């Protein structure tokens, strides 16, 4: 594949004066190329490999400065009448990516819609292995002037339908204002996955022409907030051109700008350009740039409701920009749908990015999240997969069968329930009557709309769809490395999961109206009971952790257990008890009226304080184990028979409880990690997770419940129409066909110039945006709901703590109400741990029998 090189040459028409050809064609990669037009492809491949390597060499060497670039452009980019940069400023509008030099052209509307086929830059065209089809030589722009649900009925269409192609995989990448590093990380990962599909020559579905069965849809949530360097990356790939989009067409405001192009260029996160010589195959890309910010759920509405009915895919892959899929992970996800026709949704493992040589593990917050992610993928997801219902398929990397998501003829189904969240949040920010009709319970519930989608999919009427976890597929993503962003992220997760969990339990009777058989329904009911217990534990988690702290640390107050002597065990307990209460008080104060970004140091101090308390709890636990063994050694007559000694140990309540406690938590963590052949996190991340555990439980839960009134979902009520891109009006009608006059690039030189500028921009370091988020005014109803919920939550946990801790208690080795409650909690936790462990084992066994 050719390369694009920047050299000064009087014959050039842009900033990159000419393309120099080198003899660096990589014939070893020829088997990765599509088989379309083999003879022409081989000729193009041999000729054009040189152009791409030229671009790479020029990009890494002899890079002129910005001033030199523009001076060169001023002398090199000329038409017959005037210099490009010498044109008047009025005709070189630089605002928001409008082309600097334009001419007015007359075009016919397509089905009363503005659709423009724009030639791609000469530099890019010369670098392509395949350039004999308009999908390679022209960028198609469509100005969507309707809502997503009306897209097909308003006469809009897409290239895959025009080419009569059947789409097996429809991949969506949603983004907001992520930078070019995050974007290229995901985009290049997707490109490599599609190349992997094309390398499967023995597959009946894939092979060299497999790229024709895959469509990648990129949805940007708001034209004004999208990162400009991401647009430069897309322009370099040929997927985007500035200056052709318009704000209004025939007096109708444009809702979304849709660009379609089949690219043969990929750019990695180091801004290196990759082509067919690096194994890149053609990829059909659809870039949907929404005019206004309407949040991720609206982006999915465009994907599912606007493009889905036209594309008619078999499997939809959902990705967040910033998540890098493994090189064959998309194929691994697709394979479970192909193997089992009852699979309606699937997800892979979400891994935390740990940096070069896992250096990010030096950050305790990242290490704790790494441990949390790993154990969730080892214990929780496999367990739920065995039952057939995964409570949440993470939107960062998951897949759905499109037929399973579709609504019925009456418009009822999973997608209907899923998109209620968008309308619901719009109502909450509207009139007071809308607030009365809706409620914040539903609003918080739809903060985790992906959980609602999973439940409605499994419970779909008269259907029997299942959800599955695919351990061989993974996606890597950045996790918050700073405490404020971590708290903000978990606030939405915790509130959404809690209220969505309540929703699932309330509506679990829908399972009986689905098409599942008796055995599967019974399994789902068992999982429902497990979810009820987990939800109750979540509600009382703050109180239960304090009770555990209270009894473990107070046990060292007893004179026969005190390791310090002279009553120091009791003094330290009193200090820790008051310190614990003070930290809780500080968290409540900070959570009720402050953003984590504004109270960063207070939250950090509380996290450190709880970590210190946890260190003391670990010391107390270790000492109690030592004393328990010592007391048992003095109390019983031990033998040389292991079985007899085990029976003696289990007959002692204190020693038995300690053994069960260790085995049902740390033992299960270690054994299950080894069985899944992933023990590394136990060595690197277990201790940070253990130390931050009280912070997880107290800080995150308190902040989440104290902010249930915050259900803001971005820019609502903004009905203004921008005019910066221009307005297209109907000038006349000819034989019933509307004709418009529109400003477009003056000639090919202008297109080439803009492409050169985008390539140069890839080497520029982006400026960091450190702007602070604005505050939103909340209605009294929001805060009233929050107040009542928090009061109920505090009352439940406080009553539990008061009832248990006011009993007579000396140490964990003496019977009391406290030790009885601790024993009950211990056995319940042990049962839940064993239940998760058995589910994980069953998942591994099922994987052995279903592999292949």
Swiss-Prot record:
Listed transmembrane segments: 492-509, 532-552, 572-592, 601-621, 686-706, 787-807, 830-850
Any one of the GO CC terms: plasma membrane
Subcellular location(s) per record: Cell membrane
Membrane topology: Multi-pass membrane protein
Ranges of biased composition (kind: Polar residues): 53-74
Entry EC no(s): 2.4.1.16
SUPFAM superfamilies associated with the record: Nucleotide-diphospho-sugar transferases
Alphabetical list of InterPro entries matching this protein: Chitin_synth (IPR004835), Chitin_synth_fun (IPR004834), Chitin_synth_N (IPR013616), Nucleotide-diphossugar_trans (IPR029044)
GO BP term, pick one: chitin biosynthetic process
A GO molecular-function annotation: chitin synthase activity
Pfam families found in the cross-reference section: Chitin_synth_1, Chitin_synth_1N
Primary localization: membrane
Reaction catalyzed: [(1->4)-N-acetyl-beta-D-glucosaminyl](n) + UDP-N-acetyl-alpha-D-glucosamine = [(1->4)-N-acetyl-beta-D-glucosaminyl](n+1) + UDP + H(+)
Record keywords: Cell membrane, Cell wall biogenesis/degradation, Glycosyltransferase, Membrane, Transferase, Transmembrane, Transmembrane helix
Region (Disordered): 27-46, 53-97
PANTHER family given in the database record: CHITIN SYNTHASE, CHITIN SYNTHASE 1
Family: Belongs to the chitin synthase family. Class II subfamily.
Function: Polymerizes chitin, a structural polymer of the cell wall and septum, by transferring the sugar moiety of UDP-GlcNAc to the non-reducing end of the growing chitin polymer.
Name of the molecule in the record: Chitin synthase 1
Source species: Mucor circinelloides f. lusitanicus
